[in-house]
Amino acid sequence: MIGCLIGEVFALEAPTVLLNVNGVGYEIDTPLSTFCQLQKGQHVTLWTHLVVREDAQQLYGFIDAQEKLIFRTLLKVNGVGPKMALGILSTLSIELFIHTIEHDDINTLIKVPGVGRKTAERLMIELRDRFKALSVQATTGSTVTSAQIQFSSNSPIAEAEAALQSLGYKPIEAQKAIAAVKADYTEAADLIRAALKSMMK
């Protein structure tokens, strides 16, 4: 099992990071909370989780070990796969997610793409005790930071829309959300953060 990878960020295309580890490039899918803290050329440690299927192997990476723990805990919930788990961690900060579970705040949880009421109720039931058993502690701060990141050659608006679509939002939803905030921000990371906040209201 690959527990973590230490290397240099070679390329970024939301939500995937190409990490150069001693000359070998690893494609790693990340939540936007991690993705938006990375810069091309940055030396970084990513805590990883490997999912092996019959047709593929996929690495998922996190800049914070606690986020990896939450991701693995989410995968144990019936009906929750890696894509939904990444969507939850991309949309909600760890602090807000834990608060949502502890206070049975279904209305917040169903705003995450792909999470319906039944899934939200199942998450509430299965995670409440697991969080207590794991002694998970909340962290402060927004899910998506305003760190300066180097995306590909696409415009910040296009990159922000693509990032939202990678979470499961429909193209029209992503376009409307970005259009509503693009007058106030020029960086892709800021656009993503502002759009997610507006959609969670």
Curated annotation (Swiss-Prot):
Quick one: where's region Domain III? Answer: 152-201
What name does this protein carry? Holliday junction branch migration complex subunit RuvA
Q: Which UniProt keywords apply?
A: Cytoplasm, DNA damage, DNA recombination, DNA repair, DNA-binding
Q: Does the keyword Lyase apply?
A: no
The function of this protein is: The RuvA-RuvB-RuvC complex processes Holliday junction (HJ) DNA during genetic recombination and DNA repair, while the RuvA-RuvB complex plays an important role in the rescue of blocked DNA replication forks via replication fork reversal (RFR). RuvA specifically binds to HJ cruciform DNA, conferring on it an open structure. The RuvB hexamer acts as an ATP-dependent pump, pulling dsDNA into and through the RuvAB complex. HJ branch migration allows RuvC to scan DNA until it finds its consensus sequence, where it cleaves and resolves the cruciform DNA.
The organism's superkingdom is given as Bacteria
Provide a GO CC annotation, any one. Answer: cytoplasm
Q: Which GO terms describe its biological process?
A: DNA recombination; DNA repair
* MF (Gene Ontology): ATP binding; four-way junction DNA binding; four-way junction helicase activity
Region Domain II: list its residue ranges: 64-142
Intracellular or extracellular location(s): Cytoplasm
CDD domains xrefs: UBA_RuvA_C
Q: Where is this region: Domain I?
A: 1-63
Q: Where is this region: Flexible linker?
A: 143-152
What family does the entry list?
Belongs to the RuvA family.
NCBIfam families with a match to the protein in the record = ruvA
Q: What does the domain comment read?
A: Has three domains with a flexible linker between the domains II and III and assumes an 'L' shape. Domain III is highly mobile and contacts RuvB.
How does it associate, per the subunit comment? Homotetramer. Forms an RuvA(8)-RuvB(12)-Holliday junction (HJ) complex. HJ DNA is sandwiched between 2 RuvA tetramers; dsDNA enters through RuvA and exits via RuvB. An RuvB hexamer assembles on each DNA strand where it exits the tetramer. Each RuvB hexamer is contacted by two RuvA subunits (via domain III) on 2 adjacent RuvB subunits; this complex drives branch migration. In the full resolvosome a probable DNA-RuvA(4)-RuvB(12)-RuvC(2) complex forms which resolves the HJ.
